[in-house]
Swiss-Prot record:
EC category: lyase
Species of provenance: Aspergillus terreus (strain NIH 2624 / FGSC A1156)
Family per record: Belongs to the type-II 3-dehydroquinase family.
Protein name, per record: Catabolic 3-dehydroquinase 1
Alphabetized InterPro entries for the sequence: DHquinase_II (IPR001874), DHquinase_II_CS (IPR018509), DHquinase_II_sf (IPR036441)
Length: 152
């Protein structure tokens, strides 16, 4: 059975490609999702994408993935620094996840340096631009057995 990956993008990532392109680049979220799906399929995995600007919707989607998804790639956007609810949802479903950020959050404003997810993530990808999505998808698809053993 193919590995199943859920790609979650948080608030304002629907503006990818047009919002602050000097920081986030010019590739759109639709382009990222299509490329991520194609890459997952080339590795024998399936990928479903979800984006929301609403914390509760993200929590609901994570909970709905329980027992149906093998790994999550999440770019929580601004919720990285504020959302205990999303953190608790990820821990509650027990699905290994990769935390992803397009920009290098550690080279930006000090308040962006803290993440509610990093200490529980199976891996963290920051500052690689949208290429980070490819890296994250590949890691989940190829190294799932290692992710499965992640101490969550």
């Amino acid at each position: 059975m193919p590995k199943s990956i859920l790609l979650i993008n948080g608030p304002n990532l629907n503006l990818l490609g047009t919002r602050e392109p000097h920081i986030y680049g010019s590739t759109t979220l639709a382009d990222v999702e299509a490329a991520s799906k194609a890459h997952a399929e080339s590795l024998g995995a399936t990928l479903e994408s979800f984006q929301s600007n609403h914390e509760g919707a993200i929590v609901d989607r994570i909970q709905a993935a329980r027992g149906r998804v093998d790994g999550i790639v999440i770019n929580p956007g601004a919720y990285t620094h504020t959302s205990v609810a999303i953190r608790d949802a990820l821990l509650g479903v027990g699905i290994p996840f990769i935390e992803l950020h397009v920009s290098n959050v550690h080279a930006r404003e000090p308040w962006r340096h803290h993440s509610y997810f990093s200490d529980k993530a199976a891996g963290i990808i920051v500052g690689l631009g949208v290429y980070g999505y490819r890296v994250a998808v590949e890691h989940v698809a190829v190294n799932f057995k290692e992710l499965e053993k992640a101490n969550l």
